[in-house]
């Protein structure tokens, strides 16, 4: 009889544990370096185009049907330069909603990041674009010279199914190497590693996140430019600043998906969807939660080719 009671007790304990433990699946989708490729047609070369946000949207809709609100759609900058459609709304029609804002709002982006070619358009253009977006454009290392405060929101917090996700945005600091100060007057661009160290401490203490995502408009082959600007330092930041689960890269137009270990031995996924909307970075984060605490976290990523998708998706 005692054995029967013991087995029953163990079953009750197991059932109790399973009732308090749940699995949460998150999907992160990333575009980068779209360069005005909103439509599947290259207006410069006057031919059909394999990339575009129109094709990306078909894939996004497919994934939203599977993940619902547990999907976050992120963009990593360099959207305001490239195809004539972007230039038209940059400098010709400066009254209407910018096509980049309109399309990204329609697609339901959750956050964006600044790229060097967005800065290239000048204050009047990128300020208007930022204001018209229904989601935050991030930039933790874009600093006002007047008061040393961030010009843009440094990070955004999302809560999905009991999981807190923080997305921290940064841009390559080498802007002064390429662009005259008249385009970014009143700003300076701080070092990415120093900025990440500062904000990671704040994020961990204030937000107590379950998942931290870095979205950096920078590649992964770090080098110093003009003797002072650390360019393409995404991998360096991932390795040297503990706390990131995922680092989303861009800027160098190179496809990349792989993991590195940070200085504490934790694995960090790095992913880069190249350019022009041909590829989307797709990240899966699966968490086992109990009483609001993370028991286990698995992160994986793939690059999805949008050439396989048409541009005629409709909302359900």
Can you describe what each PLM-predicted range is?
Residues 20-304:
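Acidic, metal/ion-coordinating pockets
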């Amino acid at each position: 009889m005692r054995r029967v009671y013991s087995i029953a007790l163990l079953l009750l304990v197991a059932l109790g544990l399973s009732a308090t433990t749940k699995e949460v699946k998150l999907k992160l989708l990333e575009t980068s370096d779209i360069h005005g490729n909103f439509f599947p047609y290259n207006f410069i070369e006057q031919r059909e185009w394999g990339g575009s946000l129109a094709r990306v949207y078909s894939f996004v809709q497919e994934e939203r049907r599977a993940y619902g609100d547990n999907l976050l759609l992120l963009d990593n900058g360099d959207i305001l330069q490239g195809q004539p459609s972007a230039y038209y709304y940059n400098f010709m029609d400066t009254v209407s909603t910018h096509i980049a804002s309109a399309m990204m709002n329609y697609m339901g982006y959750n956050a964006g990041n600044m790229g060097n070619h967005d800065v290239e358009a000048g204050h009047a253009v990128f300020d208007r674009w930022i204001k018209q977006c229904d989601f935050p454009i991030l930039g933790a290392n874009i600093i006002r010279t007047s008061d040393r405060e961030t010009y843009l929101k440094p990070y955004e917090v999302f809560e999905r199914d009991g999981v807190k996700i923080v997305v921290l945005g940064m841009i390559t600091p080498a802007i002064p190497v390429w662009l005259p100060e008249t385009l970014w007057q009143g700003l300076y661009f701080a070092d990415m590693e120093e900025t990440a160290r500062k904000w990671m401490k704040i994020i961990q203490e204030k937000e107590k996140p379950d998942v931290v995502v870095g979205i950096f408009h920078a590649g992964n082959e770090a080098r110093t430019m003009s003797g002072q600007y650390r360019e393409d330092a995404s991998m360096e930041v991932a390795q040297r600043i503990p706390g990131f689960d995922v680092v989303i890269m861009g800027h160098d137009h190179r496809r990349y998906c792989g993991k590195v270990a940070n200085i504490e031995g934790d694995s960090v996924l790095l992913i880069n969807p190249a350019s022009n909307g041909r590829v989307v970075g797709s990240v899966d984060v699966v968490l086992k939660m109990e009483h609001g605490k993370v028991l286990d976290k698995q992160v994986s990523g793939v690059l999805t080719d949008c050439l396989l998708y048409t541009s005629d998706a409709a909302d359900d």
